[in-house]
Amino acid sequence: MINQTAKKILKALSFDGVEVEAFRHMADLKRLDPMKIFYKKVDEKIYNGSHAVPIRIFFPSEKSFRESEEKKHDIQDKKLLLFIHGGGWVTESIDNYERICARLANATGQYVVAVEYRLAPEDKFPAGLEDCYAVAKAVYSGDFMLNIRPENITLIGDSAGGNLCAALSLMARDRGEFMPNRQILIYPATYNDYTENSPFVSVKENGSDYLLTAGKMQDYIDLYARNEEDKKNPYFAPYIAVSYTHLRAHETR
């Protein structure tokens, strides 16, 4: 239960409308969070056609970093989290999620690879998804500095990142180039309609007064889509896929 004081504050901050630049500046404030744990990172790029997709690799320990550099150790049996950040396909970055990814690596003992996919509205669907797919394909196929067995790789993403994890898994199944074994989808945005026409009771009951409003969600959807036809594409909204056969097990939080 939310106490009454907190509820009043949330209600005051719950408004519709997405101001792209203002929201991006607010998201950047995450960088002020001080890090008090060891972490080592390396920035690399993976190409999606002619576009270089920045990625950031987080190492769980100094030893794991040395092993990857020296290439004297077989790291295929190590584990890796391929992390896709949230932000409504419009805000956030691997810089803003650095603390989360570093803590994930530290807490799990796994490598973490974060993807800097292109954002809407400058680059609408499916640009960001194709960036994530290109990175996933390289990581799962071993065409990458960390040669980890595919069965030891987990896709993980929150909100819009959860959407992109689910969508690229559908895309991977359909294209037949690789297949993720595991997904962790953290409150994934998998549908295409947060208006009064939404079939979900939760949108009607909780679509206001809780900071992220249904109106904001719909604005993010509209900023991401090029047109109404995009919204009918299961790669845009994985919930509407006709079939989920031949997809591996996933976990939703």
Go through each PLM region and give its residues.
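Primarily recognizes the serine-hydrolase "nucleophile elbow" in alpha/beta-hydrolase
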Residues: G142-M145, E151-S198
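Hydrolase active-site cap/lid region
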Residues: D174-E228
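Short substrate-entry loop that stabilizes the transition state in hydrolases
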Residues: G87-C101, A105-T108
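Catalytic nucleophile-loop/oxyanion-hole region of alpha/beta-hydrolase
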Residues: S93-I94, I100, A114-N152
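Short beta-strand element of the alpha/beta-hydrolase
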Residues: K78-H85
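Active-site nucleophile elbow and catalytic-triad environment of alpha/beta-hydrolase enzymes
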Residues: L223-V242
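A glycine/proline-hinged amphipathic helix-loop "lid/cap" segment
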Residues: M1-S61, E69
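Conserved small/polar residues in nucleotide/adenosyl-binding loops
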Residues: T245-T252
